[in-house]
Amino acid sequence: STSFCPDSASTATAIATGHKTESGVINMCPWTRDVPYETIAEKLHAQKGYKVGIISSVNIDHATPAAFYAHQKTRKNYYQIGVELANSGFEYFAGGEFQKVNGDGTGPNNHEVAAQAGYNVVTTQAGAAALTAGAGKTLIIAENLADGKAMNYAMDAAAGEWQLTDYVKKGIELLDNSKGFFLMTESGKIDWACHANDAAASIHDVLEMSNAVQ
């Protein structure tokens, strides 16, 4: 993108693939929008045998996490992005709910698509906590969701409610192997807090991201 203010889709595409594209486009050539760009996560998975995990505190099909597994002409193709998630074969996904989980209502929802592709679809915190190494491909949708079907801000989370750090710990537990793993972790709620000019929420989520990295 040549925009002075690019969006999450084009900037995440640049991070994930090394290619520029237009705002709103996820991992596609900006001129024709019909040539996909391979992501670093896809390369590590296919060429090096790495296990791959994707985590976001916002919707798991939001532009930034999607830029590591999806290829779409527009970031608004939420259902199709969810289908690509299931088809990626990546071993671990965790975060907020799909934005258009039911698509147009004529086919299986994104949870069903993932299950059909061999994923354990976990929607409770207890279920997530019970997962152990060897569980297989796993999709965790946070049990406690806020507006926009994203995870709660760290400052709003109830006592004992899983936050980003917990999903990172679980991801490391499930992905650890002799060949290595790649775990993309986004604290998308920092972005949402800044859009809302909510300094307190932003600070708490920055601290939560710091805890997750440590």
Which residues are covered by each model-predicted region?
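Cysteine endopeptidase catalytic domains of the caspase/legumain-like
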Residues: 38, 152-153, 157-164, 168, ...
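Short, structured patches in soluble enzyme cores that scaffold and shape functional sites
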Residues: 97-98, 143-145
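Generic structural signal for bulky hydrophobic/aromatic residues embedded
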Residues: 18, 47-48, 144, 174, ...
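Active-site His/acidic residue clusters
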Residues: 63-69, 145-158, 177-180, 184-213
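Active-site regions of oxyanion-processing enzymes, predominantly non-cytosolic
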Residues: 124-141, 167-188
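N-terminal catalytic scaffold of extracellular/periplasmic and nuclease hydrolases
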Residues: 1-104, 108-137, 207-210
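Generic structural signal for well-ordered alpha-helical scaffold segments
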Residues: 82, 169-173, 214
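Intrinsically disordered, low-complexity coil segments
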Residues: 45-51, 146-148, 160
